[in-house]
Amino acid sequence: YYYDDYGFLDILDTSVANRLTYKRKTGYSQQAAAKTYLTGKRVYSLTNDDQFEIEALYYDRFGNHIASCTHNINGEYSYTYQKCDLSGTVLKSFAEYQTADGGSVTESAEHTYDHDSRLTRTRYTLNDTLVNTRYFQYDELGRLTRLSRNNGTTYASYEYDLQGNITSIKDVDFEQKLYYNTGDGIPRYNGKISSMKWLTPSIDNTDTITNGYSFAYDQQDRLVSAYSSSGKYGQERYTEEFTYDKQGNIAMLYRYGG
């Protein structure tokens, strides 16, 4: 590991050092001094001491990591850039991967936030082509309630209880419910999950399959059993039980069914 400056680049081949040296990218944060920060990493091959991957890391004047340049043992280079605001929040990022034969791939992401600094939109671009946009919605308590993907054509929704524990996740072909002091398990009032179930479509998409688990804990709140309650496979298939030693390590693990 290297810190404080970029003198380690001087011991590299000139061509490699030049390509790992920071070059400003328009629209992204500007490099500043890196005193006290990690500036480089060298990772050697386990089979050949002459082969290594080396990375240079760069920072802005607020100490935010804003760029990296990497050269690997295959002769490939990768470059990443970030634009950050004063608090260090990433507003946009860019990455380029260059192969040894001269090929390259670029990807970028732009992030939008609301007045409470919550992420509301991310736009992903691959080789200058927009490939996906994600939208994020929140409730009045700041909890994520909806995630829209694929430019808004698919989505997942989330529900919570009064304590802020997530209770439901619904996606296109998947639904999961988590129970704390309700459901089939022993009620838990400390945030531990007492049971859960999830629903998925059958292979031929003509039916909905329900699977589930009920959980039990010991007096130290360690998980001691997970009992399967699958409607398709029958009771206790994939059930697990745990025992612990005096130090809290798992001593025995039992699995049933399969």
Task: Set out the residue ranges of the language-model regions.
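Acidic/glycine-rich beta-solenoid
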Residues: 6-60, 65-258
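Short, compositionally biased serine/threonine- and acidic-rich segments at solvent-exposed termini, linkers
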Residues: 2-4
